[in-house]
Regions:
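Interdomain/boundary linker segments immediately adjacent to catalytic/signaling cores
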Residues: 10-79
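Charged, structured surface patches that assemble and position nucleic-acid processing machinery
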Residues: 161-207
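Short, well-structured alpha-helical interface segments that form or flank functional binding sites
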Residues: 62-70, 98, 125, 129-132
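A broadly used, surface-exposed interaction patch
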Residues: 72, 76-98
């Protein structure tokens, strides 16, 4: 993994703050990530060793929650119609379910329900439960399509596509979602920003 010297990181951050096309990411994504507060690891092993460590898992979970908020903002700021701006909860079979993303695409007019996942490496039972939830929520919403959205992958690899397509579900990456709406940044700018600005922030928090 490439390590950038501290002064290099500072230069990149200053450059991005003054680069007009990055204003949107600075104003929307960065504050969400900066608001993450790591928790201490709750581990019997660490306790026995009398070691205090921050939970990297808590940081990743918080990142997943905030990146979901960010992409809802992106959808709202585009010409697509964000259907969950006022309410992202729905009753499904007696249970309250959270809606990650639900919008009508300006590109193809399709009503999409997307389940946001930063990781697709589930065990088989969790995959079944998650797939079932997507189909149930899609039906309750009356959406045309239910699918997974991975906000940290440019394009989904063929292995994951095949695995989920065989179960009747699609999986989309960032490039696909950006193609559905007019956005204020490109896919290259997004991933460069994650690497050069967001990564150092999360490292400083203990990731």
């Amino acid at each position: 993994m490439l390590r950038i010297p501290a002064m290099g990181i500072l230069f990149v951050i200053i450059l991005l703050y003054t680069f007009p096309t990055m204003d949107y990411l600075n104003e929307t994504l960065l504050p969400l990530i900066e608001s993450i507060t790591p928790r201490q690891s709750e581990s019997y092993t660490l306790s026995a060793l009398n070691l205090n460590r921050q939970s990297s898992q808590s940081i990743l979970i918080s990142f997943g929650e905030r990146i979901e908020q960010f992409w809802n903002k992106v959808i709202s700021d585009s010409n697509s119609l964000n259907l969950i701006e006022d309410n992202n909860l729905i009753e499904v079979n007696g249970k309250t379910r959270q809606i990650d993303h639900n919008f009508v695409s300006e590109e193809d007019g399709v009503n999409y329900y997307l389940e946001s996942k930063c990781n697709l490496n589930f065990d088989s039972e969790k995959i079944k439960a998650s797939n079932k939830k997507i189909n149930e929520v899609r039906e309750a919403l009356g959406a045309d399509e239910g699918a997974y959205f991975v906000p940290v992958v440019r394009e989904i690899n063929q292995k994951d596509l095949t695995k989920y397509n065989n179960k009747g579900l699609k999986v989309y990456g960032v490039e696909w979602l950006l193609n559905q709406s007019n956005t204020k940044f490109t896919v290259d700018e997004y991933f460069t920003y994650l690497e050069t600005v967001i990564a150092p922030v999360l490292e400083n928090k203990g990731l």
